[in-house]
Design a protein with these regions (language model features):
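N-terminal export/targeting and maturation segments
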Residues: 20-107
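Hydrophobic membrane-insertion alpha-helices, especially the h-region
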Residues: 7-25
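Extracytoplasmic electrostatic interaction patches
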Residues: 74, 80-175
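Short, Lys/Arg-rich N-terminal segment immediately upstream of the first membrane anchor
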Residues: 1-4
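Basic, mixed-charge low-complexity alpha-helical segments
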Residues: 9, 27-31, 160
C-alpha cells in the first residue's frame, strides 16, 4: 500500500471516529432533554430538581428565568448546584436533599423576631419535617415552635413559590 493510501485511511478513520462521537454526544444530550421534559410533564418534582441541579448545564437557564444560583466555578467545584434562591413573597432557598425530598430554607418575622425555618419536603412538596430557630437574648440559636395554622400558611407560600419556579423553568426551557 502506498503512503498516500495509508494517510487517507488514517484521515478517514479519524473523521469517522470524530463524527461518531459527536453524534453520540448530541444523541445523549437530546435524550437528557427529553427525559427532563417528560419529568416536568409527569410532575416528578424530585427528578426535575435533581436533573436541574446535577451540574452547571442548566445554571444559565435558571439565571435566565430570574433565579439565583452559585457562580459556575462554585458549581463545578461542588459537582452541581447546591441551592437555588427563589425571591418572592419570602426569600426561599431550595436544595435537593436526596432521592426522596427537597430542603427549603427561609427567614420570616414571628413576634418581632427573625425566625429561620427549615422544611424537608416530599415529592408533592408537603412537609415531612420542619424546624424553626430564633436567636435568644444570650445570642444563642434556639429551637422554637409555631402554631399549626402558621405552619400551614407558610407551607402554602413555600409550595406556591416552588410551583412557580417549576412552571417558569418549564416555560424557559421548552417555551
Amino acid at each position: 500500500m502506498s503512503g498516500h493510501k495509508k494517510i487517507l485511511i488514517v484521515i478517514a478513520s479519524v473523521i469517522v471516529l470524530v463524527t461518531g462521537l459527536t453524534l453520540y454526544f448530541q444523541y445523549q444530550s437530546h435524550q437528557e432533554y427529553l427525559q427532563l421534559k417528560t419529568s416536568f410533564e409527569e410532575r416528578d418534582n424530585i427528578v426535575v430538581l435533581q436533573r436541574l441541579m446535577a451540574s452547571e448545564k442548566y445554571a444559565p437557564d435558571i439565571r435566565k428565568a430570574g433565579y439565583v444560583v452559585p457562580p459556575d466555578g462554585a458549581i463545578r467545584l461542588d459537582g452541581g448546584i447546591d441551592s437555588i434562591e427563589i425571591k418572592g413573597d419570602i426569600d426561599l432557598k431550595i436544595s435537593h436533599s436526596g432521592r426522596n425530598g427537597v430542603t427549603a430554607y427561609f427567614e420570616i418575622e414571628i413576634d418581632g423576631k427573625i425566625t429561620s425555618a427549615l422544611y424537608e419536603l416530599d415529592k408533592n412538596f408537603d412537609i415531612t419535617s420542619s424546624a424553626y430557630f430564633q436567636i435568644n437574648e444570650k445570642n444563642i440559636n434556639e429551637r422554637v415552635n409555631i402554631s399549626q395554622s402558621e405552619e400551614e400558611r407558610l407551607l402554602k407560600i413555600v409550595q406556591s413559590e416552588i410551583d412557580g419556579f417549576m412552571k417558569k423553568m418549564y416555560q424557559t426551557l421548552y417555551g
